[in-house]
Amino acid sequence: MAHLLSASCPSVISLSSSSSKNSVKPFVSGQTFFNAQLLSRSSLKGLLFQEKKPRKSCVFRATAVPITQQAPPETSTNNSSSKPKRVMVIGGDGYCGWATALHLSKKNYEVCIVDNLVRRLFDHQLGLESLTPIASIHDRISRWKALTGKSIELYVGDICDFEFLAESFKSFEPDSVVHFGEQRSAPYSMIDRSRAVYTQHNNVIGTLNVLFAIKEFGEECHLVKLGTMGEYGTPNIDIEEGYITITHNGRTDTLPYPKQASSFYHLSKVHDSHNIAFTCKAWGIRATDLNQGVVYGVKTDETEMHEELRNRLDYDAVFGTALNRFCVQAAVGHPLTVYGKGGQTRGYLDIRDTVQCVEIAIANPAKAGEFRVFNQFTEQFSVNELASLVTKAGSKLGLDVKKMTVPNPRVEAEEHYYNAKHTKLMELGLEPHYLSDSLLDSLLNFAVQFKDRVDTKQIMPSVSWKKIGVKTKSMTT
């Protein structure tokens, strides 16, 4: 199990048993402590274990191989003389979470990562692999320390285990929690019954535990929760930022904007939003829900500092996002896979803007009892528009880019009205990176650089919204 959770970590692992209550201690430039019990009683149980095994109290201690390179601490860009704010990044080993953790650390926040590393396990289970080779979380954090002098603490465990999460909260005492720690793929949630159940249990129960942890151990803590623009669906009216004012039968009220989720994943995000809104009202929690659009790109200033800091980039049909997938398809000469009519329109943003938006939300926290909703994207594109942009950019690089129409595996409108508001983050200072020719060139060149790592069998969609069933499905057969 430890091997699965940190498959690429060059570490020394020892196992000790104890009848006493396990304590949670952070990784700080060299050590990790995580509780194996939490995995056996969490939502990971069905994914990790093929048969029931006796439970025992144990603690894994993994000591990362030390890195000798050391740099002096970087001068802070934060002019405040007060104690640096402490930010817990849940899901900090993932695509958006890793980039965010590094960005906040560089900005002089005290950062810890909480992660069960299950995203890496999904790759093992489904036969998938990031386009980019990624280092273990232990090597990543050690390299960051060596290059910048800044420490990132690491708590390896499952937030669906409240005891683990509570101990992490009490140990780190965060001022803000950035919550990326959810199963984030709509196709994954539609593979079969077990993945649908896992997605909803992991996401909804995990977020509930975070809310209870804030209530019990950090009532002033600000929750920055990553939601999704997919909560709204594709209504035939403008999409507002979280709330809409309605006049009905002569009476007017401002209400939460209607939700029309299109997968079990998106539904889990809707449930999260309702639970967070309720606890803000009932308990006075302060929360910001960032309804994020589709993220593209892989490079940030921090992840480009060293190859061991490199972020993952998914190109497969389960975890890959549209623009990233198209660029990889173009790089290997595979026709761009346009689902259905290709008129599906969504909000998009560069990963550099993801980290910027999170920083803005932390620096401008919600008030006590306030449930604040920001729509987090910078531009809108249809699938056909993205395909045209990639085709044009690819031709400049000498790539022969073609397009193919694929029967849509999803249940969604393929031609529709779409106009979503996204002004609140701009008003707070977001400086967006718009999709430009130079950015597309960079992303395409990056895909070409690693094209030998592409498994073309993973490009075509194999998950159907209508064919989901009870039987557990293997993606490798």
Curated annotation (Swiss-Prot):
Residues 1-86 form a transit peptide. Optimum pH is 7.5-9.5. The keyword Transit peptide applies. Its cofactor is NAD(+). Induction: Induced in response to altered availability of inorganic phosphate. GO terms for cellular component: chloroplast; plasma membrane. GO terms for biological process: cellular response to phosphate starvation; glycolipid biosynthetic process. Residues 1-21 are annotated as: Disordered. The active site is at 228, 265 (proton acceptor), 269. Its main location: plastid. It is an enzyme of class 3 (hydrolase). GO terms for molecular function: sulfotransferase activity; UDPsulfoquinovose synthase activity; zinc ion binding. It is found in: Plastid, Chloroplast. Substrate binds at residues 184, 228, 265, 292, 322-325, 337-339, 410-412. Concentrations above 100 uM sulfite inhibit the reaction. Its EC number is 3.13.1.1. NAD(+) binds at residues 95-96, 115-119, 158-159, 184, 202, 265, 269, 295. CDD domains: SQD1_like_SDR_e. Keywords: Chloroplast, Hydrolase, NAD, Plastid, Transit peptide. InterPro entries: Epimerase_deHydtase (IPR001509), NAD(P)-bd_dom_sf (IPR036291). It catalyses: sulfite + UDP-alpha-D-glucose + H(+) = UDP-alpha-D-6-sulfoquinovose + H2O. Homodimer. Belongs to the NAD(P)-dependent epimerase/dehydratase family. Involved in the biosynthesis of sulfolipids found in thylakoid membranes. Converts UDP-glucose and sulfite to the sulfolipid head group precursor UDP-sulfoquinovose. This is UDP-sulfoquinovose synthase, chloroplastic. It comes from Arabidopsis thaliana. The lineage of its organism: Eukaryota, Viridiplantae, Streptophyta, Embryophyta, Tracheophyta.
